[in-house]
């Protein structure tokens, strides 16, 4: 392992011991904000420190075993100890480097999930509904909560657009690679000739930012319209103008929310979505600039980037970013998408490790 990495690990170890002492200090215990912040930092460092401790122990084991190689009676046992320790050391070093990768501070946040029907007419709307059901079932398996903020239903079923807030542990970290174009190839129910059609939807995943991190939005840049919330088929579901549509004039972004019966609550939710969209747009712009110099699995910021194809006749799903194909389409559409999500996260970490190893 590089001396620079060992030096960084030593510093983290010192900080861990410092935090341990601080958490036992009466003045910190009486200050809930400080205690909470230190506890969080302490728990984040715990795995790194314990893994580093194991790394040091394995190196010590190897050094001690090497001293026994000249002893004929102990040589065989020493060689076994060295081999076993070196094998484990390799795994521990790899794990340590992953733990040292820069953390995306947004990973632990809840996420807004937006699904929009694209090309393909009614079939695209039906597929948007299928995707929302897939993510909802995945959320259920993860014990996350899904709250629909806005929905525009398609005439043949599914959605022209749906926006939901997904709440739980590490939601954004798990779902952020889902942003992009999702394409479906199948025979629509309305197709009498049995021809395969291709339709598409775009998915956008954005972190729900805490108020302290939300950008300031100039009220003069907003146009706010109110209207009556509609249910399926267009019927009005209440008699007051509680639904809210906010247009951000400089960017043309439009956010609607009709989830609550209170206009005030709908406005607050719509503003929160708008704030996240504005931050995401800025991050996408940076991602597009980075994508010109290196591969970026988070995409170039273009929501039409085709990331995945769902082929029903062949029962397969292909992720085009890492050339991964699985032949368990039914399971995937029922929410079992970890086998698509985890390889992308692993590949992203490998890219980060490669960038880290290029540093002096």
UniProtKB/Swiss-Prot annotation:
Which PROSITE patterns would you find in this protein's record?
RF_PROK_I
Fetch the Pfam families from UniProt.
PCRF (PF03462), RF-1 (PF00472)
Q: Which residues carry this modification: N5-methylglutamine?
A: 235
Question: Could you tell me one molecular function GO term of this UniProt entry?
Answer: translation release factor activity, codon specific
Q: Where are the transmembrane segments?
A: none
Q: What are the GO cellular component annotations?
A: cytoplasm
Q: How is it modified after translation?
A: Methylated by PrmC. Methylation increases the termination efficiency of RF1.
Signal peptide from the UniProt entry: none
The record's subcellular locations are:
Cytoplasm
InterPro entries, A to Z: PCRF, Pep_chain_release_fac_I, Pep_chain_release_fac_I_sf, Prokaryotic/Mito_RF, RF-1
What keywords were assigned to this record? Cytoplasm, Methylation, Protein biosynthesis
UniProt-listed SMART domains: PCRF
Q: Its family?
A: Belongs to the prokaryotic/mitochondrial release factor family.
Q: What does this protein do?
A: Peptide chain release factor 1 directs the termination of translation in response to the peptide chain termination codons UAG and UAA.
Q: What is this protein called?
A: Peptide chain release factor 1
Query: Source organism lineage?
Result: Bacteria, Pseudomonadati, Pseudomonadota, Gammaproteobacteria, Pasteurellales
């Amino acid at each position: 392992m590089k001396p620079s990495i060992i030096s960084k690990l030593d510093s983290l170890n010192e900080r861990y011991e410092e935090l341990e002492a601080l958490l036992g200090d009466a003045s910190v215990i009486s200050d809930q904000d400080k205690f909470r912040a230190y506890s969080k930092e302490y728990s984040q460092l715990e795995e790194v420190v314990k893994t580093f401790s194991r790394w040091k122990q394995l190196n010590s084991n190897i050094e001690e075993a090497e001293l026994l190689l000249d002893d004929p009676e102990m040589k065989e046992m020493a060689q076994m100890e060295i081999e076993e320790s070196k094998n484990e050391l390799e795994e521990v070093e790899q794990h340590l480097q992953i733990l040292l990768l820069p953390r995306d501070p947004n990973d632990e946040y809840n996420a807004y999930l937006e699904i929009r029907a694209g090309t393909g007419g009614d079939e695209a709307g039906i597929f948007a509904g299928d995707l929302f059901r897939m993510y909802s079932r995945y959320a259920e398996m993860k014990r996350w909560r899904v709250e629909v903020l806005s929905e525009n239903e398609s005439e043949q079923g599914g959605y022209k657009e749906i926006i939901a807030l997904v709440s739980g542990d590490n939601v954004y970290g798990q779902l952020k690679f889902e942003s992009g174009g999702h394409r479906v190839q199948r025979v629509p129910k309305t197709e009498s000739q049995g021809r395969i059609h291709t339709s598409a939807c775009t998915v956008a995943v954005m972190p729900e930012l805490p108020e302290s991190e939300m950008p300031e939005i100039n009220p003069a840049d907003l146009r706010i319209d109110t209207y009556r919330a509609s249910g399926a088929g267009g019927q009005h579901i209440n008699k007051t103008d509680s639904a809210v549509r906010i247009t951000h004039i400089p960017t043309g972004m439009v956010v609607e929310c009709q989830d609550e019966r209170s206009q005030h609550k709908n406005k607050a939710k719509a503003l929160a979505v708008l704030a996240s969209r504005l931050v995401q747009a800025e991050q996408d712009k940076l991602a597009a600039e980075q994508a010109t110099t290196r591969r970026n699995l988070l995409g170039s910021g273009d929501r039409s980037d085709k990331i995945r194809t769902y082929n029903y006749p062949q029962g397969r799903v292909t992720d085009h970013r890492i050339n991964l194909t699985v032949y368990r389409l039914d399971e995937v559409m029922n929410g079992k998408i970890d086998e698509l999500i985890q390889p992308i996260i692993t590949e992203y970490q490998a890219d980060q490790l490669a960038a880290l190893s290029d540093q002096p």
